[in-house]
Amino acid sequence: MGVKLLAIAWGLAEATVFFIVPDVLLTYLALKDPRRAAKACLWVLVGSLVGGTAMFCWGNYDLKGTEEFLTQIPAIDEELLNKVEQQIDDDGVKATFFGPIAGRPYKIYAAYAGAKDISFPSFLLVSIPARLLRFILLTWITWWVASKLLTKLQTRKKAFVLTAVWIAFYSWYFAIM
């Protein structure tokens, strides 16, 4: 029950206020138990969709307030908001699929989808593969690397390697954003 609630909460938090992706949790779970990690992907998706729904509604109701809130989150600034808004204007709901793959926060796409009167069912349907694809892919890659390339390392050492990877990733991400 603990992992399920943590996965839902992290998915919800990252889709609204938090800036560390739930993939961190999922990849650590994948080191020990890929099936448990795969199930957690679904629970993260549930939380993410709830959070995306909240941001969609807030963007529809009060885009200015949503934008002010979003710019208080690390790595989100007005320039990024403008890029996402333009992408939503140009590509509609498809932007919700491709944007987060490019490293742009889903929460921004959700807010602008609501503000730009994209249909909620379309937004939700696109959100499912947009979120789940990355969760499952990173979980699978982590499991594969840990079980095929790092076979001689103990789980604790694999976790250390994974920690180093996440620290390097976020150091790079915050440097470019």
Where are these regions (language model features)?
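Membrane-interfacial segments
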Residues: 29, 33, 62-74, 145, ...
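Membrane helix-loop-helix hairpins that form the core translocation module of multi-pass transporters
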Residues: 38-82, 86, 90-94
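Final/C-terminal transmembrane alpha-helix of multipass membrane proteins
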Residues: 158-177
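Membrane-interfacial entry segments at the cytosolic side of transmembrane helices
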Residues: 39-42, 152-162
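Hydrophobic alpha-helical membrane segments of integral membrane proteins
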Residues: 2-43, 85-148, 172-175
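Hydrophobic transmembrane alpha-helix bundles
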Residues: 41, 60-65, 78-80, 134-144, ...
